[in-house]
Regions:
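Glycine- and aromatic-enriched membrane insertion/assembly motifs of diderm outer-membrane
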Residues: 43-104
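Gram-negative outer-membrane beta-barrel proteins
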Residues: 36-42, 85-89, 104, 119-123, ...
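Residue-level signature of outer-membrane beta-barrel architecture
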Residues: 69, 100-102, 139-141, 170-172
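Repeated loop/turn-to-beta-strand initiation elements of outer-membrane beta-barrel proteins
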Residues: 26, 74-77, 105-109, 141-149
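Residues that define the transmembrane beta-barrel architecture of outer-membrane proteins
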Residues: 24-26, 57-61, 90-94, 107, ...
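Bacterial Sec-dependent N-terminal signal peptides
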Residues: 1-27, 172
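Transmembrane beta-strands of outer-membrane beta-barrel proteins
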Residues: 29-33, 80-82, 110-116, 152-154
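Outer-membrane beta-barrel "beta-signal"
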Residues: 31-35, 98, 161-172
């Protein structure tokens, strides 16, 4: 390929990235929620060292901070860190967060998906770690161009338990 072709390809790539970056914004979400315990997803035939399920009927609360990128004010992709408290059992969670707002109106539905890891300091030595998966649906209300509030609920599976999260949050 000659120099002209290289310059044209470089120009096209720069224009594509320039257009893409102009529609991306750094964004932060802060959310809190109530986690209503439903049931254990695993049933255990107890052995001599078994100390009980990771969560045994405990409801919880959490506080999450998520840093990410908004793309075209419809898609949000981020990484989050959360504090968990299940009736005295403390823990941390780390997760990836994907959110979709289908409409660009002031009031719009939202779909949220989280995948990650949670660790609880419970009755087991050094606590227990487990995968985390959450699917939520809710409503997003745009207060200003850069400030949204939202509420959502759905299903959360972690620590061998199924929970119903009811969350409220703010995005800026």
């Amino acid at each position: 390929m000659n120099k002209t072709t290289h310059y044209i390809i470089a120009l096209i790539v720069m224009l594509i990235f320039n257009h893409g970056y102009s529609q991306m914004n750094y964004s932060v979400k802060v959310e809190t929620g109530f986690l209503k315990y439903q049931f254990n997803t695993v049933h255990v035939d107890p052995g001599p060292n078994w100390k009980g399920y990771n969560l045994e009927g405990e409801n919880g609360i959490d506080l999450n901070v998520i840093n990410g990128i908004d793309f075209k004010n419809k898609w949000f992709i981020g990484i989050g860190l959360g504090y968990l408290n299940f009736e005295g059992l403390n823990g941390l969670s780390m997760f990836s967060d994907f959110e979709y707002l289908p409409l660009k109106t002031r009031l719009t539905p939202l779909v949220n998906l989280k995948f990650g890891y949670s660790h609880l300091w419970n009755q087991y030595e050094n606590g227990t770690g487990a995968g985390l998966a959450e699917l939520c649906f809710g409503i997003n209300f745009k207060l200003t161009e850069r400030l949204d509030i939202y509420t959502k609920s759905g299903f959360l599976i972690t620590q061998q338990s199924m929970l119903i999260p009811i969350r409220f949050g703010i995005r800026f």
